[in-house]
Regions:
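An exposed tryptophan-centered "aromatic clamp" motif
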Residues: 68-81, 87-135, 156
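Sec/Tat signal peptide C-region and signal peptidase I cleavage site
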Residues: 15-21
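Short, small/polar residue-rich loop motifs at catalytic or cofactor-binding pockets
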Residues: 24-26
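Short, structured beta-strand segments at or near domain termini in extracellular proteins/domains
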Residues: 117, 142-157
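General secretory precursor processing signal
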Residues: 12, 45, 58, 98-101
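Sec-dependent N-terminal signal peptides
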Residues: 4-13
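Short aromatic-cysteine micro-motif
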Residues: 28, 33-35, 40-83, 87-90, ...
C-alpha cells in the first residue's frame, strides 16, 4: 500500500504544469480554458492565415472610444459578443520565459512588442486603463483612454 502511495505522489510531481494546457487552437480562435474565454488569435487589423499559421496584415491601434465601434463591427462579422480582455485575462498571455514578444507565439503569432489595451479601468484614475506590454511582460496603467494602442478581442464561453 505504501509503495502505491509513493508511486502516486511521484507521478503527481512529474505531471506537466496545467498552465501549459491553458490554450487550444481552433483556427482563427484560441480557446482559453483557464479564463473561459475565446480569443481572436490575431491583433485587430490582422487576419489569420491557416496556410502559413500566422497573422497577416497591419495591426490597428485605436483609442477606447474607437474600440467600441470596432467591437460592434466584430460582432457583425463574427458570431458572439466580443469585448476587450480584462487585465487578468490579458496578463495570462504573458510568457515570462519567452523572448520578446513575451507571449506564446504558437498561439498568438504577430503580437506587437508593445502595450495592449485591456478593458480594465484604473480604480484611482477612471480616465486611465490598464495595459500589458508584450515587450517586457509588465502591466501598466499609464495610458489615457484617448491614446491609441493595439488590442485583442475575447468573448466568454
Amino acid at each position: 500500500m505504501l509503495k502505491v502511495l509513493v508511486t502516486i505522489c511521484i507521478a503527481f510531481i512529474y505531471l506537466p504544469n496545467t498552465s501549459s494546457a491553458q490554450f487550444f487552437e481552433q483556427g482563427q480562435f484560441i480557446k482559453d480554458i483557464e479564463n473561459r474565454v475565446l480569443w481572436l488569435r490575431c491583433s485587430v487589423g490582422q487576419v489569420w492565415s491557416p496556410e502559413t499559421k500566422t497573422c497577416a496584415g497591419k495591426i490597428v491601434k485605436l483609442n477606447q472610444e474607437e474600440i467600441k465601434v470596432a467591437i460592434i463591427q466584430a460582432g457583425e462579422q463574427l458570431p458572439g459578443a466580443w469585448r476587450l480582455p480584462t487585465l487578468s485575462e490579458l496578463e495570462s498571455l504573458v510568457c515570462s520565459s519567452c523572448t520578446p514578444a513575451k507571449v506564446k507565439n504558437k498561439y498568438f503569432p504577430g503580437i506587437a512588442r508593445e502595450a495592449y489595451w485591456s478593458g480594465t479601468r484604473n480604480s484611482f484614475n477612471r480616465n486611465m486603463f490598464w495595459s500589458v506590454n508584450f515587450q517586457t511582460g509588465h502591466k501598466y496603467s499609464r495610458f489615457m483612454a484617448y491614446q491609441q494602442l493595439p488590442f485583442l478581442l475575447v468573448q466568454d464561453y
